[in-house]
Amino acid sequence: MKKISAGLLLTDGAKLLVCHVTGRNFYDIPKGLVDDGEEPTAACIREVREETNLLIKREIIADLGVYEYTRDKDLHLFLLYRRDLPDTGNMGCSSFFINKAGRRLPEVDGYRYIALKEKEIYLTQNMARVIGTALTI
């Protein structure tokens, strides 16, 4: 059975919040695996808080559905449209991992807003494809 990640598209219609993945050469949306017994909406809210320190409420996000992401993982996307986007300078990551050298590092080490039309420049090919599909339905 495929794993499910839940993620948030935080946008004003032209720009999208992306997070720089520590140690990698690409950005990603705030997302993460849905734990056993966890609702995708709750997983999305939890992952956004862990990766950005943003507190979002269930009532203000729209469920965009589940999309085929990789061979072994699907992506359950949620949308938060805001005319005034939060300041990336106030964002921070409280979720860590241990790298190959044994150092404890944040999963995310930077934030920016990208133009939706430039998503292929910053995101992986699969993520750009899924977002393009989700936002055109």
Spans of model-derived segments:
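Residues that flank catalytic or metal-binding motifs in active/ligand-binding sites
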Residues: 4, 74-76, 107
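Hydrophobic (often cysteine-bearing) scaffold residues that line and stabilize catalytic clefts
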Residues: 40, 123, 127
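Catalytic phosphate/metal-binding cores of nucleic-acid and nucleotide-processing enzymes, i.e., regions
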Residues: 1-4, 21, 31, 44-45, ...
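Active-site-adjacent beta-strand/loop module that shapes the phosphate/pyrophosphate-binding cleft
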Residues: 67-100, 112-117, 129-137
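Hydrophobic pocket-lining residues within nucleotide cofactor-binding pockets
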Residues: 34, 116-119
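Preference for well-ordered, secondary-structure-rich cores of eukaryotic proteins
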Residues: 105-106, 118
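N-terminal strand-loop-strand
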Residues: 1-29, 78
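The catalytic Nudix box helix
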Residues: 29-63
